[in-house]
Amino acid sequence: MEERLEDEGGGRWERARRASGGRRWLGPFLVIVVVPILIGAVVALVLGRNLGFEAVRRRTVHKFPDVQWVSTAELATWREDPGRTQPLLLDARSKVEYQVSHLRDAVLDDAARPSLRPVKGLPPNNPIVVYGSVGYRGARLANWLGRQGFTNVRNLTGGIFLWANEDRPVFRDTRPVTEVHPYDHRWGLLLVSGVRAAAPDLQTPFAAP
């Protein structure tokens, strides 16, 4: 009886020792293997978005070589400068997208059906900044405005997607919000998850948003 108790006690001690040894290995395993994998996945996702924006920009510049561009940082600084003539902001997306969110004070001018109504009475050299989701539709509208005689038009690099990804303000009417219409489930991957609105895919005639 005593021997059996000793055997059982020894077995429990051995199991506890092995479990403790396993736990000692768990920390180094997480640090050496799991954490780098997770970090690598995040880095790959960020780099993938950056490459996606750059690929769209290159393609758009090739198609609309005369269009000028302005970066998100440049526009943000510009809008905070009271000594500088402020640009008219034109949203080149659809009404459905615009209603989800837009840049502050931006006026809708859908690139699929461009109109001169938003720029009526504006001097030809007045600064105008246009934007789409990622830059393509903005460039299309900027190119069209240039053909109508407007000489100071810029397209926002990365569009509202990059603007919102950088935690810059977007609005629904006059109320600050955080979400942006994703255009569709594929292009929406360029939006960070906290910014991507839940919305059905759009059907548009454009090669990119």
Model-found features: residue ranges?
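Membrane-embedded segments
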Residues: 133-138
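Structural motif
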Residues: 88, 127-129
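Rhodanese-like catalytic fold shared by cysteine-dependent sulfurtransferases
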Residues: 2-6, 11-81, 99-126, 139-209
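Active-site-adjacent beta-strand anchor residues
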Residues: 91-92, 131, 156
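Short hydrophobic beta-strand that contains or immediately precedes a catalytic carboxylate
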Residues: 75, 87-93, 106
